[in-house]
Amino acid sequence: MNIAAKNITPTVTTGPLPASRKIYIPGDIHPDIRVPMREIGLHPTSGEPPVIVYDSSGPYTIEGADIRIEQGLLDLRRNWVLARGDVEAYQGRHVRPEDNGFASGERLTPEFPTLRQPLRAKDGKAVTQLAYARAGIITPEMEFIAIRENLGRKAQAEAMVRDGESFGAHIPDHVTAEFVRQEVAAGRAIIPANINHPEAEPMIIGRNFLVKINANIGNSAVTSSMAEEVEKMVWAARWGADTVMDLSTGRNIHNIREWIIRNSPLPIGTVPLYQALEKVEGIAENLTWEVYRDTLIEQAEQGVDYFTIHAGVRLHYIPLTVNRVTGIVSRGGSIMAKWCLHHHRESFLYEHFEEICDICRTYDVSFSLGDGLRPGSIADANDAAQFAELETLGELTKIAWAKDCQVMIEGPGHVPMHKIKENMDKQLAVCGEAPFYTLGPLTTDIAPGYDHITSGIGAAMIGWFGTAMLCYVTPKEHLGLPDRNDVKTGVITYKIAAHAADLAKGHPAAQLRDDALSRARFEFRWEDQFNLSLDPETARSFHDETLPKEAHKVAHFCSMCGPKFCSMRISHDIRAEAQKEGLEAMAAKYREGGDLYMPVDAVEPSAG
């Protein structure tokens, strides 16, 4: 179908963030790699070098970049994949009406204009990053990640601060490609990188690396379109998402996903069960292993980087949820529970798990083992159903590892603060330190409309305790499908949580940006304050609501305190006077009864 004829080519947000430019650091082992980072320039009066930060926005934030959504992004990794000599191109499966929910005519989203033959592993080969790591091979993806995780640390080594409690995580001062290989080989980290998604920039998920965040997008049977979902993906990447999950449940799932993957610099995850359910017209009881298997291959050929598989929902666990306040809240979990009860047999996901591993191994699709029995209310947190499923996920992890498949484990959910650490400790023990990937958790149930905050609290805590990736929650959680603005709010909230966790864990480069912003704040460099923040646009707009003039951008006060009550301005005055008179003279002055301090013995006791 001619995409131009229907005039629906989406437009997406492009252009650099304020005072920022993209820089690239080359590889040593693989000199052809170029690792992107964002350099934030500071005002000349600061006397400070630019601040380098992690950047996952792809080409969309390059000044003057020629972005053509109908052409997709450059296939960054394709030559790396082909050079290994263990893959082959093949015809692949044909798109069928059920792949797009039987949409037709004007309701059918057009196919992506340029499709290439998919790749798969040659017979007997494992093309996963785990297989390469176990064989002692440092892939270009691994070196790319090592450079990316260092955040330019070689140049900033003297300014690094090590301060925190890591709860057993071992974050090195300098990440090497060999360290990345070792962590992947041990199963403590994954590199979600399907051989059919060469547009994605390599990233890593593991507790000995920076805490990552995921943003969920996707249409529903009620609302949204391909153009909106592609823009949501780009928008999420712009504000700092590390991966995106396409959780579409309506029509056009196949074609929308193709547009997203071809334009995504981020790994893309899915829940294949959702599309499989659409193929049987939404009737859970009609699901079969054959339909599900076909869906896995379909999505793997497109380039999905990780699958959420709810294989831990077993028939004999379902009665454990009967007395819960909120039952089974996972969509995938409830679908499989309904199927198991109707057929009164074990889940086909559990029974065919080794075959699922064989498919994932063929394309290097990572597992995200789903928590289908996660608690949906704090009353249900840490119950028998939740932890029974976790034990099964630990068993499945060992099976996947034996097949050279990469694995992370999904976690809750709704958990009050005092029960969060138990989740992390159990997961590490039961799942062999496979990376933990949690939805929040939400720490209270009383705040619909503010669940990005209730969950951000839990996310910061569990990230500190060792969770490797945090799945964002938006203000629309429990209320509706997030729009573009909700996506940004969710991403920024979770960037805060992830960064707070990195600080608490003692990540050596985490505090550099905080300190740079604090110095800018103390020195009243307003533009630097805005530009160093996670959301420069919002910071600037809040300031300008009350002090909009350009002259206010150099003022030594804000509208909160005004010029006479600004604590930082008073601190400057104290410093200036101290430098003028000398600290000792100042101390003597105060001891003699200065205007700031009163001797303790001069204070009259209270009458009571």
UniProtKB/Swiss-Prot annotation:
According to the UniProt entry, its GO molecular function terms are: 4 iron, 4 sulfur cluster binding; carbon-carbon lyase activity; zinc ion binding
Residues annotated to bind Zn(2+): H414, H478
Question: The organism sits in which domain of life?
Answer: Bacteria
- Recite the UniProt cofactor note for this protein: Binds 1 [4Fe-4S] cluster per subunit. The cluster is coordinated with 3 cysteines and an exchangeable S-adenosyl-L-methionine.
Q: What cellular component terms from Gene Ontology apply here?
A: cytosol
One of the Pfam families matching this protein, by short name: ThiC_Rad_SAM
EC numbers on record: 4.1.99.17
* Reaction catalysed by this enzyme: 5-amino-1-(5-phospho-beta-D-ribosyl)imidazole + S-adenosyl-L-methionine = 4-amino-2-methyl-5-(phosphooxymethyl)pyrimidine + CO + 5'-deoxyadenosine + formate + L-methionine + 3 H(+)
Gene Ontology annotations of biological process type: thiamine biosynthetic process; thiamine diphosphate biosynthetic process
Any stretches that span the bilayer, and where are they? none
Q: In which pathway does it act?
A: Cofactor biosynthesis; thiamine diphosphate biosynthesis
The residues that the entry says bind [4Fe-4S] cluster are C558, C561, C566
Q: Name the keywords, alphabetized.
A: 4Fe-4S, Iron, Iron-sulfur, Lyase, Metal-binding, S-adenosyl-L-methionine, Thiamine biosynthesis, Zinc
Q: What class of enzyme is it?
A: lyase
Q: Which residues bind substrate?
A: N216, M245, Y274, H310, S330, R331, G332, D371, G372, L373, R374, E410, Y437
Which co-factors does it depend on? Answer: [4Fe-4S] cluster
Describe the task this protein carries out.
Answer: Catalyzes the synthesis of the hydroxymethylpyrimidine phosphate (HMP-P) moiety of thiamine from aminoimidazole ribotide (AIR) in a radical S-adenosyl-L-methionine (SAM)-dependent reaction.
Q: Which family does it belong to?
A: Belongs to the ThiC family.
Q: How does it assemble?
A: Homodimer.
Q: What name is this protein filed under?
A: Phosphomethylpyrimidine synthase
Organism of origin is Rhizobium rhizogenes (strain K84 / ATCC BAA-868) (Agrobacterium radiobacter)
Originating gene = thiC
